[in-house]
Amino acid sequence: MPAKKTAHKRRVKKHVESGVAHIHSTFNNTLVMITDVQGNAVAWSSAGALGFKGSRKSTPFAAQMAAEAAAKSAIDQGMKHIEVSVKGPGSGRESAIRALQAAGLEITSIRDVTPVPHNGSRPPKRRRV
């Protein structure tokens, strides 16, 4: 008896004109996620997903490459205008925003949504180098 063939569903490309770019920049990595206005993911990328390993993930260049990759994928799905929300203290914040603009997306607004603790958990100890 022959094995049944399973039909793979093709991924339907969404056509969204405007959306939100969420840039999460940590000390170790930079993640760029582009969503529609409701929050459904359209495209994403990160420095680690592009092959950067270790301390190279935390560089501004890695953040720039991650933003370019996510922007290219979003532009392929018809995105033109984005709002940018940046979270975290990492070094890739500015370069990721510049890369989104250079890729051809029109930035309408930039928000900093970094969470600020009202004296929450204890921070990591100071480094002694």
Swiss-Prot record:
Gene3D superfamilies linked to this entry: Ribosomal protein S11
Domain of life from the UniProt record: Bacteria
A Gene Ontology term for the protein's cellular component: ribosome
A Pfam family matched in the record: Ribosomal_S11
UniProt keyword terms in alphabetical order: Ribonucleoprotein, Ribosomal protein, RNA-binding, rRNA-binding
GO MF terms held by the record: rRNA binding; structural constituent of ribosome
Record-linked InterPro entries: Ribosomal_uS11, Ribosomal_uS11_bac-type, Ribosomal_uS11_CS, Ribosomal_uS11_sf
rRNA-binding among keywords: yes
Any one GO biological process: translation
Statement: the UniProt record of this protein carries the keyword RNA-binding: yes
Similarity remark: Belongs to the universal ribosomal protein uS11 family.
NCBIfam families, per the entry: PRK05309.1 (NF003698), uS11_bact (TIGR03632)
Subunit structure: Part of the 30S ribosomal subunit. Interacts with proteins S7 and S18. Binds to IF-3.
Function: Located on the platform of the 30S subunit, it bridges several disparate RNA helices of the 16S rRNA. Forms part of the Shine-Dalgarno cleft in the 70S ribosome.
This protein's name: Small ribosomal subunit protein uS11
